[in-house]
Amino acid sequence: MGQLDGKVALITGAGGMKGIGRACALKLASQGADIVVSDFKREPKDLPPQEVKAKWRSIDSVSEEVEALGRRCLKIWCDLTVSDQIEDMVRRAAGHYGHIDILVNNARAIIGRDRVGVTDLREEVWDRFMRINATAMFLATKFVGRIMIEKGNGGRIVNMASDASKRGRAKMAAYNASKFAVIGLTQASALDLAPHRITVNAVCPGSVNTDRLNYWEADQAQAKGLTLEEFRAGIVADAGKSVPLGRIAEPEDVANLVAFLASDEAAFITGQAYNVNGGTLFH
């Protein structure tokens, strides 16, 4: 018996081969939950090279892995910049399983085009980061929250924030602002939903060893005459040197905390923002 037996978890941004969303899907499934995985259909140019080489098929591949664990999995393609698609995603998930017990708001905008000073930041880039990282999370919380209230069985909402939710950095205005918004949404919705026994918490990873495409990394690799894999390996090694525990996080490190916050053991925890960073930030 798993601690999430009988639960249904909806996870956004779940299609990456080395992503946090996939790690969450597999972790929650391993503990007994049935899963809904959602992601945006990307063009080949927007896929990490390792996914292309491996012929990875986004949420199709994740769904097969979940089913191999003996759990059911529903796949839903969703563009989080379109409000109607978010509402339809939630409606389909609830209609398929009859309920949603866990929401993991994991999706984020592809970083890189935002890595400029605030005076050079384009409004459309700012808008996209706010739309995907904050507005889409609000809408998913709104629609799933309504279903949880209607069913009357409580629920768990886990929002993927970042250490950038707690500390501003130069050339990160759009990302910082969108992730600071996640903390505000988490705290306010935790209070709104507490009377219904629905908890809302945030997870704040530091650097994580994922392969999600980063436009800045791609541009830097090209400028240095390196493959993206070579450049990223150097980034991972260098970043690990500044972490007290000696390495950056793996997606599974983040998924472990998500699974705890999704469980009955976390029933009295709400409105919190937990770091997963190996000791690089303490508040």
Where does each model-flagged region fall?
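Canonical Rossmann dinucleotide-binding motif of NAD(H)/NADP(H)-dependent dehydrogenases/reductases
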Residues: 2-38, 42
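Conserved mid-core segment of classical short-chain dehydrogenase/reductases
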Residues: 49-60, 87, 109-127, 146, ...
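Short C-terminal tail/terminal secondary-structure segment
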Residues: 115, 167, 241, 245-247, ...
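Catalytic Tyr-X3-Lys loop
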Residues: 119-138, 158, 182
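Active-site helix of classical SDR
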Residues: 141, 178, 186
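Alpha-helical segment proximal to the catalytic Tyr-Lys
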Residues: 146, 191-192, 267
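Residue(s) in the substrate-gating loop at a strand-loop-helix junction
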Residues: 162
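Short, small/polar-rich loop/turn modules that mediate ligand/substrate recognition or access, typified
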Residues: 194, 199, 269-271
